[in-house]
Design a protein with these regions (language model features):
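Glycan-recognition and catalytic cores of secretory/periplasmic carbohydrate-active enzymes
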Residues: 1-156
């Protein structure tokens, strides 16, 4: 049985790195081909269904482990959740290093916020096709990310 201290060290090892790049379950849909396929599907589901079904099956069952043709990426939500984990660890053991590393994540978030808005905000960090007429670019803030980041700043 793994001890509580060992669990904390294991968790800490995941959230203390300088580079938190990771794969995303939706990697296939942020590729140029994936975006094109989603737009086609949004325009005509009957024509595009075999294509997007094939893409999904290949990605889930054959490429899920290998992640071929996908590049790992830093995501604001990963940094925010890592900062919150470190704040939790600090509250448990009082180790200042957890708080220092949480601050590094928060500094990264400030430097990587979406540009051109009235205040800091964050999005996915990649193009996301919503419909055949609406595509969010890499710099579009979304409510799916910003609240977690705001919570990390408030808790710090």
């Amino acid at each position: 049985m793994i001890s509580t201290d060992q669990k904390r060290k294991l968790i800490s090892s995941f959230v203390t790195g300088d580079d938190l790049s990771t794969s995303d379950p939706y990697d296939v849909w942020k590729t140029r081909f994936g975006c094109w396929s989603k737009k086609l599907y949004a325009k005509n589901r009957f024509i595009a269904l075999p294509l997007v079904a094939a893409i999904t099956i290949i990605d889930v069952y054959f490429n899920n482990t290998l992640r071929l043709a996908y590049k790992k990426q830093e995501y604001p939500i990963v940094r925010a959740l890592s900062a919150q984990v470190l704040i939790n660890l600090y509250q448990l053991d009082g180790d200042e290093q957890h708080l220092n590393t949480a601050k590094q994540h928060l500094d990264w978030l400030l430097s990587e916020s979406c540009l051109g808005y009235s205040g800091p905000c964050w999005g996915l960090g990649f193009k996301w096709v919503v419909s055949d007429t609406l595509t969010y670019d890499e710099n579009t803030p979304l409510t799916t990310a910003t609240p977690y980041i705001l919570e990390a700043f408030i808790r710090y």
